[in-house]
Amino acid sequence: MLYGAVGFSLMTPLAYAQAIPAAAKMRPKVIVLTAFPPEWQAWTVEKSFQHQVLHVPGLIKPLICDSKDVCVTETGEGEINAAVTVTSLVKDAALDVKKTIFIRSGIAGGVDEENSALGSVYINNWVISWAFGHHYLSDQKQLAWSPPGCTDYATPGHCGNYTRNIMENLAYKINPALLNMAVNASAHVALENSTEAKKLDKTFAISAVPKVMVGATITGNDFWIGKANQAIAEQIVRRYTHGEAKYTNTAMEDLGDVAALSRFGLADHYLSIRGISDVDVPPPGKTEEEIWKTGDLYASALAERNAVIVTEAVIAHLLKGTA
């Protein structure tokens, strides 16, 4: 197991300027990272998380915890907010997170593939950067992408090493042992569904039955949509994982989470669990511009709920290992 039995002691919120004895530090077993109010509220409705509230400098919301040392916070949207939050948690004098499992739990954009119903949940095996490299308009006036130059991210002779490189954050492979545990823990969960989601599934001609799957998530701060960008996302994931992973969902925070953890040697303590709220291409008969004018089609509430269901199953399994 990645952590042993953990003690839990109440602390006054602000002894940050003073050295805190190691025995007095709070040691969360799990910290769930949410991005924005609907994801946060999907957890805060559970009164168990009012057992302890810790105000951590650098966080936009407090760290709220239950009696089993499982905590939740809201990071804000995007890679920068995610990285600032995770760094603040790791460096806070009142916390010891050396054995904590960090789980990003929230919604994501999915793909228009038959088996990827809205409300499905991906336990991600890779976290990939959308932004690095070169996004441009080709001579044929098509959206295009090329990878960063080798000297931008790698030491000489290691141009193919996109993973955990020393100069840019391009790709992180999730700890296989932690990933397998999460997949096994959620193998028999019952996901919810909704009439709204089923209608959208029919619109996109995809499955109407949400399921738990494994795939790669790509992280970027800009909201994009369309077949051209989808093809670029697929290209990036293939390149950075050497064909090992398949692009299945897109979100805004995960790379910031795991890159920050990596700086402290904690990248192997990270999971990304994402519920599919929308599809990354317009519905048939609609253009990208029409979507910007009218708004995308979402099943956000279902995606949030199912992400929580899977995350709770994973947490329950983790806690069994510390009993």
Label the model's feature ranges.
Residues M1-A15:
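N-terminal export signals
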Residues Q18-A323:
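Accessory terminal and edge-of-domain segments that mediate assembly/interaction
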